[in-house]
Amino acid sequence: MSTANGSSPTRISILGEESIIVDYGLWLNYVTHDLLNNIPSSTYVLITDTNLHSLYVPQFETAFTSASAAATSNSSATPPPPRAPRLLTYAIPPGEGSKSRDTKAEIEDWLLEQQCTRDTVIIALGGGVIGDMIGYVAATFMRGVRFVQVPTTLLAMVDSSIGGKTAIDTPMGKNLVGAFWQPRRIYIDLAFLNTLPAREFINGMAEVIKTAAIWDAEEFSALEQNAPAILSAVRTPASAAADPNARLLPISDILKRIVLGSARVKAHIVSADEKEGGLRNLLNFGHSIGHAFEAILTPQVLHGEAVAVGMVKEAELARHLGILRPAAVARLVKCIASYDLPISLEDKRLVRMTGGKSCPVDIVLAKMAVDKKNEGKQKKIVLLSAIGKTHEPKASSVDDRAIRVVLSAAVRVQPGVRPGLKVDVTPPGSKSISNRALILAALGKGPCRIKNLLHSDDTEHMLNAIGKLRGASFSWEDDGEILVVEGRGGQLFAPSEGELYLGNAGTASRFLTTVAALCSPSSDGDATSTVLTGNARMKLRPIGALVDALRSNGINIEYMGKESSLPIRVDAAGGFGGGVIELAATVSSQYVSSLLMAAPYAKEPVTLRLVGGKPISQPYIDMTIAMMRSFGIDVQRSTTEADTYHIPQGIYTNPAEYTVESDASSATYPLAVAAITGTTCTIPNIGSASLQGDARFAVEVLRPMGCTVEQSASSTTVTGPPLGQLKGIPHVDMEPMTDAFLTASVLAAVASGTTQITGIANQRVKECNRIKAMKDQLAKFGVHCNELDDGIEVTGNSWTELTEPREIYCYDDHRVAMSFSVLSVISPHPVLILERECTGKTWPGWWDVLSGVFGVAMDGEEPLSHSTVTGSGPNNRSVFVIGMRGAGKSTAGKWMASTLGRTFMDLDTELERRHNTTIPDMVKSEVGWEGFRKFEVELLREMMETKPEGYIFSCGGGIVETPEAREALISYCRAGGAVLLVHRDTTHVLEYLNRDKSRPAWSEEIEKVYIRRKPWYQECSNFEYHSPHLGVEESAVEMPVDFARFVSLICGKSSHLREVKAKPHSFFVSLTVPNITAHTATIPKAVVGSDAVELRVDLLQDHSPEFVVRQVALLRSLCKMPIIFTVRTVSQGGRFPDADHAGALALYRVALRMGVEYVDVEMTMPEDVIETVTKAKGYTSIIASHHDPKGTLSWRNGAWMQYYNKALHYGDVIKLVGWCRTDEDNFSLLTFKTRMLAAHESTPIIALNMGEQGKLSRVLNGFMTPVTHAALPAAAAPGQLTAAEIRQALSLLSKIPKRKFYLFGKPISKSRSPILHNTLFQQTGLPHTYSRLETDKVAEVETTIRASDFGGASVTIPLKLDIMPMLDEITDAAKTIGAVNTIIPVPVQAGKQRLRGDNTDWCGMVHSLRMAGVTGKRACPASGVVVGSGGTTRAAIFALHSLGFSPIYIIARNATSVETIASSFPAEYDIRNLQGTLAYTEGMARPEVVISTIPATGDVDEGILMAVDSVLTLPMGTSNTGAARVLLEMAYTPTFTNMMARAKDAGWGTVPGFEVLAAQGWFQFQLWTDIKPVYSTASSIVMNGTSDSS
């Protein structure tokens, strides 16, 4: 039988049967006939997943029906054949979540319902999940029925479908319950791969690489060579091909080869060892560790991705054990990476997909302990001995200690080296020479076989980058020991896709910057530039001098982030101009080498002139010139000009072979181990003839320190002095070997005397500030160092007196790590060195050498902390405020500076100070507008460079008029800085500008100016504050709460998400209003009891960004709580058009600019939209959501997993909303949520069901439940409840325990506190009660406050002082006031609680005064007055001080009491006893607030009344005009007192005592419940005196 192309398929024998059938087009043209003719049955059951069902099942049903009918009609049998066989189909949700006991049972029950019998044939159509699980169903159903595999993924084709392993997953791990059950057929139809997503295809390549790595070196080489072609085809979008099914046509032969190759190997091994007795273990290479990773990270990480990382770790383990050569490890890693598979758990994609979930080593080892290959407790791992070969023909026994070292992020080095040890160590190839050799060979013509190339992160980045630029092709020989580079003579092209990511490879970044300038645009014209970028540290390292030199030679280079650092965009100009190039070479010699190596390809011969002082690291420049000569270009050093070089034009001629000398910097570490331990070490291939300056280390550093040094032209041997007898060097200039200073420093730490090292200033701008790093980390050993301008001074200690460091931090710097490993071998104590793997930059196998060659014992360890370094971090970056003049920039800037504790600077004011003139006069002078703008830009750039942290700068309104200023601001945003646009309504701006004479007059209409500047303001800023607060009289305005919240968010100081995660129940109210403006009275009531408010943008009447900005600003000012910004599409249950992705993205950008706390992003949005939002989110939290309003997804199976996984990838919070039809749906949801939280506890989940029957899920959700409110026009979703309703339900379920609250004191019978709190409890749905406990004896309340159901208490006279000793803690406010009026139980552990005493009397006073117009900020100083000296007086003083009033006068009869009170407060309160009347004096702070604390009934002392009258009648000063003057009466009855009447007659405002009662109770309620009612509600309850409803 033939396939679609007319050819016969390829058959592979397994277990004596040719049951594996491979070709294109089998599914519709071959499978049905083969089944009917060779595996007959009355019932065929096709089981697949819901993703594949619609794609492949209908067509197969048609083909099956036709073939079955034809077979029946063509039969001539007598009697006639039975009726045609039936074909049943069943679909399950896709993903690893379906590979479970529940799904298996569901399928089995369905098979029984369909009356399937033992002759049934099951067809498993799908990937590994389907094949594994359906195979297990077949193995157990009716005690075993026949089944066939139809793998649709590459991984299933080459691995899981072959061999008869079937299984399901359990909580303990993958595939732990299953059976060996061989399929009767395995139909491998390669056409399925055309529709396989790229990630799934790449996932399968891990198994292909694995098979070649253990079995076939030739096939492995083919995989290396074919990686670019395979990836290119796989990543071609289906839409880009004329026929989507032809996407992989260019690699069809390659595909068939790799599938056949892998399938044949597996079939051979299975045939020899079906039940995994030994040989079949080899197929588990990478799986022992990989399966453990997968068990922890499933289902977010795919099997092949976990195995890829597992292969790397198991290869590193083989290297650590001395079995596998480092070059083979490097080759395997490069091959895996070339297929875009992860090679580390730190891979950014894995981190994002798993929500940053870690794989603790202890858990990984525990997962590995249940591996089926193990024998008892002995772990068995497949160890490679070479590419294509294993150490044993089975898995090998490996101790946990060795595994732990390889898995751990840190290593604890145990001191001790065997006395008399003599070793030979060959370090890896020189990093400097390796990188130069790669550049030269790629730019050269013809093949070049490079030997001893360094296999490290740096060279990997270089190789990958050259490959992307199509500068050369690469292949490996001699098991990865030789790299063959086929250079293309300088023909390079800008990369068509992606940027050049260089990690922290500084050498590569400098060299490739100039190489990128040689690139031409890509052949398709799509790529006209090259972007070079790196990790966070790389983005701080300098490259400015090199960029300046290239720019001066005609190359356009753009900084995409921080000025003078990566990332940069280099135009593909096809080469730079040449001629004379001047370069500052005092920072890095790599700048010089970069230009030297690329110079032959310039458009004219180059003369390179080094300026600015003596070039740094001259030996490295000499090395570059010597190597260029080896490749056929002879550089001439000028004989007439200092530091000048002449480079001819030409093309490098590649030598047939080039051997990279071992790295002399790396060689210093084994030599230093010998030196510090008194042993002997020989480096056989570095001597006096070396090109490298560091080769002088042994002679110029170690010999003076007391070592015996023997050095020939090609080798170096060092023998250290007896232990503890190293001698310090008074001074050594290490400028020729700067990288080696770290090694010298650790030796100096245990040498006698003081060693001074100079000439190493460039080491401050390497991977870290190495000089400071050595000083700080040596201090942990008790070694004292001094930093010098260009070096370090180390005072040695005896090695026996070294202190034990808690840990050594390595700054992600390989040389720091290796240097401290040297010191660790003689430390009196074991030393924990963090960031073990950073040595991979130059010597990936260093720890293996230290362990295997020097015999140093070490243990892998997971540190408790990841860093001991502290810094200001990005949160302290200076902020630039821009906007129109009069928009409130200075006010907002001062607010920011105040709340963040930073320095405010107005750049216009600073410019006037520097030029000693006003801006209007400057513009009128010969300087003019042009000169002013020039000064303005210069000042802006200076502030960005010299004050990058700790400042808030207010810029002039016209700063954006200058292109250079706009470029600087845009660059600042890109580099992670904050530029804030402040805006308010234009009418307010006009009002201000019409009377502002401090700036030049407008020469055109203001609105025209704003319209012109508006797009510039937008592009120059990344945050925007639209203010309803910034009035004309800005100096008198206090910072609004919403602005403080905004600033907290954009500067990374918001803690809201952390706070709500800690709460047992939290809510957000969903607004369903078309315009916030029309509901300003409703919204404050609707948000009560919620922790956030959701703005349903899709429900607004206008979706324009301008309208939405105003809506967000108004909502933020109204409700003063975090905002959830939601654009819900139609298909997700909202009203925003599904197809308007651009509109949705524009709105998301509005949200991020406005610094909202949460943005809801639907997971059905296109990937590019989601990626754009998540990359730009800053400190905004993403709620990754998916809604199923049609109820098509079930919580019982794995249907929700694909959405959960995607949400976990992108979200800080996950929101999944289904539909409920039965109560069971709610319980299934709860089970799903519990399981997901157990797997990823750091990522909270909102999971609930819509519909009436889904209300229970809302009650039980717990975290951030969406709610409605009676005041809103409609609920946002079917079944949505109010927060109060949910609390009522929770109390019925005992999820909110009923608490008892009290009022303590005497007399209290007339107190209105019970009605206040009981009403508020009822309104918010809380089950609590508040009652009076009248007593004047504090002992009578002790049992009550320690009861388990005690919820809190109000305390009044006479117990406010007596209660304090009975409490566990007192707030600072209550301590200062000296009285407690509120008791708050604070949970601590397991039902226990501490009692905290607080005082809300002063809070009530402050709130009442603010409501009356009093602010804490005023135009000029003002004083306050307290009448009386009783218990309330102290709270009144505290309240006035908190509002900034000073001095504070006390009017009272008893002078002694006043003195006592005054002396008990800090002097800064400035409390004065007012005797008699208060007379006006020049410059005095006039009183603006009087608080009366004396009884309102009975006679008041005449002296007090006279003093009060003198205060009330004191004339208001001109500067105080407009300030509120208020008397606050603390007495409750009568409602209008004599004191209030006097104040009113004097023109003062008054506040009755009941307001304070209501306010202090309002604050108490918030402290007890964390719910903030509308104040007017509390006030109304108290004022109206409604009867107690309880």
From Swiss-Prot:
<feature type="binding site">
    <location>
        <begin position="883"/>
        <end position="890"/>
    </location>
    <ligand>
        <name>ATP</name>
    </ligand>
</feature>
<dbReference type="Pfam" id="PF08501">
    <property type="entry name" value="Shikimate_dh_N"/>
</dbReference>
<feature type="region of interest" description="Shikimate dehydrogenase">
    <location>
        <begin position="1298"/>
        <end position="1590"/>
    </location>
</feature>
<comment type="function">
    <text>The AROM polypeptide catalyzes 5 consecutive enzymatic reactions in prechorismate polyaromatic amino acid biosynthesis.</text>
</comment>
<dbReference type="InterPro" id="IPR010110">
    <property type="entry name" value="Shikimate_DH_AroM-type"/>
</dbReference>
<dbReference type="InterPro" id="IPR027417">
    <property type="entry name" value="P-loop_NTPase"/>
</dbReference>
<feature type="binding site">
    <location>
        <begin position="192"/>
        <end position="195"/>
    </location>
    <ligand>
        <name>NAD(+)</name>
    </ligand>
</feature>
<keyword id="KW-0862">Zinc</keyword>
<feature type="binding site">
    <location>
        <begin position="207"/>
        <end position="210"/>
    </location>
    <ligand>
        <name>7-phospho-2-dehydro-3-deoxy-D-arabino-heptonate</name>
    </ligand>
</feature>
<feature type="active site" description="Proton acceptor; for 3-dehydroquinate synthase activity">
    <location>
        <position position="276"/>
    </location>
</feature>
<keyword id="KW-0028">Amino-acid biosynthesis</keyword>
<dbReference type="InterPro" id="IPR036291">
    <property type="entry name" value="NAD(P)-bd_dom_sf"/>
</dbReference>
<feature type="active site" description="Schiff-base intermediate with substrate; for 3-dehydroquinate dehydratase activity">
    <location>
        <position position="1215"/>
    </location>
</feature>
<feature type="binding site">
    <location>
        <begin position="96"/>
        <end position="99"/>
    </location>
    <ligand>
        <name>NAD(+)</name>
    </ligand>
</feature>
<dbReference type="InterPro" id="IPR008289">
    <property type="entry name" value="Pentafunct_AroM"/>
</dbReference>
<feature type="binding site">
    <location>
        <position position="207"/>
    </location>
    <ligand>
        <name>Zn(2+)</name>
    </ligand>
</feature>
<feature type="binding site">
    <location>
        <position position="165"/>
    </location>
    <ligand>
        <name>7-phospho-2-dehydro-3-deoxy-D-arabino-heptonate</name>
    </ligand>
</feature>
<feature type="binding site">
    <location>
        <begin position="127"/>
        <end position="129"/>
    </location>
    <ligand>
        <name>NAD(+)</name>
    </ligand>
</feature>
<dbReference type="InterPro" id="IPR056179">
    <property type="entry name" value="DHQS_C"/>
</dbReference>
<dbReference type="InterPro" id="IPR000623">
    <property type="entry name" value="Shikimate_kinase/TSH1"/>
</dbReference>
<dbReference type="InterPro" id="IPR013708">
    <property type="entry name" value="Shikimate_DH-bd_N"/>
</dbReference>
<comment type="similarity">
    <text>In the 2nd section; belongs to the EPSP synthase family.</text>
</comment>
<feature type="binding site">
    <location>
        <position position="159"/>
    </location>
    <ligand>
        <name>7-phospho-2-dehydro-3-deoxy-D-arabino-heptonate</name>
    </ligand>
</feature>
<dbReference type="GO" id="GO:0003855">
    <property type="term" value="F:3-dehydroquinate dehydratase activity"/>
</dbReference>
<dbReference type="GO" id="GO:0003856">
    <property type="term" value="F:3-dehydroquinate synthase activity"/>
</dbReference>
<feature type="binding site">
    <location>
        <position position="174"/>
    </location>
    <ligand>
        <name>NAD(+)</name>
    </ligand>
</feature>
<keyword id="KW-0057">Aromatic amino acid biosynthesis</keyword>
<keyword id="KW-0418">Kinase</keyword>
<feature type="region of interest" description="3-dehydroquinase">
    <location>
        <begin position="1071"/>
        <end position="1285"/>
    </location>
</feature>
<feature type="binding site">
    <location>
        <position position="303"/>
    </location>
    <ligand>
        <name>Zn(2+)</name>
    </ligand>
</feature>
<keyword id="KW-0067">ATP-binding</keyword>
<keyword id="KW-0808">Transferase</keyword>
<protein>
    <recommendedName>
        <fullName>Pentafunctional AROM polypeptide</fullName>
        <ecNumber>4.2.3.4</ecNumber>
        <ecNumber>2.5.1.19</ecNumber>
        <ecNumber>2.7.1.71</ecNumber>
        <ecNumber>4.2.1.10</ecNumber>
        <ecNumber>1.1.1.25</ecNumber>
    </recommendedName>
</protein>
<dbReference type="GO" id="GO:0008652">
    <property type="term" value="P:amino acid biosynthetic process"/>
</dbReference>
<dbReference type="InterPro" id="IPR023193">
    <property type="entry name" value="EPSP_synthase_CS"/>
</dbReference>
<dbReference type="InterPro" id="IPR036968">
    <property type="entry name" value="Enolpyruvate_Tfrase_sf"/>
</dbReference>
<dbReference type="GO" id="GO:0046872">
    <property type="term" value="F:metal ion binding"/>
</dbReference>
<dbReference type="InterPro" id="IPR046346">
    <property type="entry name" value="Aminoacid_DH-like_N_sf"/>
</dbReference>
<dbReference type="GO" id="GO:0004765">
    <property type="term" value="F:shikimate kinase activity"/>
</dbReference>
<dbReference type="InterPro" id="IPR030960">
    <property type="entry name" value="DHQS/DOIS_N"/>
</dbReference>
<keyword id="KW-0547">Nucleotide-binding</keyword>
<keyword id="KW-0511">Multifunctional enzyme</keyword>
